[in-house]
Amino acid sequence: MAEGLAAEDESYRILRSRIDLSRLPPLCRTVTEHVIAASADFDYATDLLCDEQVLAAASAELAAGAAVVTDSAMVAAGINGYPVICKSEDALTARLARTAGISLPAAAVRLAFGQAGPGAIWVVGSEPAALGEIMARNVQPSLVIGLPAGLAGAAEAKDAVRASGLPALTNVSEKGGAAVAAAAFCALATAALASGELDATTLNSR
């Protein structure tokens, strides 16, 4: 445990020695640092599109108990200490994907819609089509973390989310992935804990 924390501290020390993100507002800076640390990709310093007010509102919703939905088990595995709704490995999800001719992450999002309710935080890192499902379902999210990777449709899907007017954290390019999406969420949760908005005791009881 101590070795892991030391390695993490060293990672952030190296990051801050190589790039100055002080121009960014606090939440955007925290998210950007987490994403760069998780990916070792400094391009995210300019590739991520963050809105401080959107992140602040989502942080408040998180503290109030907002549901968190992921499009895949890989994204869910990267979110430690916060309960998530993830339907990607349910038998019903596989059946829906086959009958509807859609991907498993898209089917997982479709099935999670009824359980999550309005105000949820949707974390998508595996499949661009999952973002299409979110837009089609009128989910009324507090935040869509839309960071799937892919050469076929990922950048376009993220652009569509931004154009939709949904509160979103996305990036411009085709890059992304489960680890990046999970890191962005964990950054938000970490910031909420540090500010006192999110109480660790309450978090562990959820």
Where on the chain are the PLM-derived regions?
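Electropositive, gly/pro-rich neighborhoods at or near active sites that engage anionic ligands
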Residues: 1-69, 78
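Glycine-rich, small/polar surface segments that engage phosphate groups of diverse ligands
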Residues: 61, 67-108
